[in-house]
Amino acid sequence: MSKVILTTEVSGLGSPGDVVEVKNGFSRNYLVPQGFAVIWSRGGEKQIEQIKAARAAREHATIEEAQDLKSRLEAKIVKLTVKAGQGGRLFGSVKTSDIAKAVEESGIGQVDKRKIEIPNAIKATGNHEATIRLRDDIVATISLQVVAAK
């Protein structure tokens, strides 16, 4: 096991500035090369303080923005047009990037595709739901209407 300092938010692991203990291979092969984390060291403690200070400064402004975005997301149904065969079965499935693009095109706002969680794979037309984690404490549930392209 090795200690790493997260530099970006990693789903299921933590937020920027958190010190977490992960398996050696996970840190060496994924987190560090992708830039999601740095190896923990005593000098890294200063980096943690800087990351946390920057996050605290951003949080005050983003709480209101996140609440506003949440209300806009939950008030509107996002329409996705995808290729489908007979019976409403999709060719492939709806991905988080498709949802993020549809949200942006509908004029609601920008959403990071990594923050979108789809509980069950969307492989058919119809109405579905997905959740978007805007912040650690603010989660929006959006309604999706998947329709077949003509």
From Swiss-Prot:
Keywords, sorted A to Z: Ribonucleoprotein, Ribosomal protein, RNA-binding, rRNA-binding
UniProt GO cellular component terms: ribonucleoprotein complex; ribosome
PROSITE patterns: RIBOSOMAL_L9
Entry superkingdom: Bacteria
Transmembrane segments annotated in the record for this chain: none
Gene Ontology biological process terms, A to Z: translation
A Pfam family of this chain: Ribosomal_L9_C
InterPro entries xrefs: Ribosomal_bL9 (IPR000244), Ribosomal_bL9/RNase_H1_N (IPR009027), Ribosomal_bL9_bac/chp (IPR020594), Ribosomal_bL9_C (IPR020069), Ribosomal_bL9_C_sf (IPR036791), Ribosomal_bL9_N (IPR020070), Ribosomal_bL9_N_sf (IPR036935)
GO molecular function, one term: structural constituent of ribosome
SUPFAM superfamilies: L9 N-domain-like, Ribosomal protein L9 C-domain
HAMAP family: Ribosomal_bL9
Role of this protein: Binds to the 23S rRNA.
Family named by the database record: Belongs to the bacterial ribosomal protein bL9 family.
Protein name: Large ribosomal subunit protein bL9
Species the sequence originates in: Clavibacter michiganensis subsp. michiganensis (strain NCPPB 382)
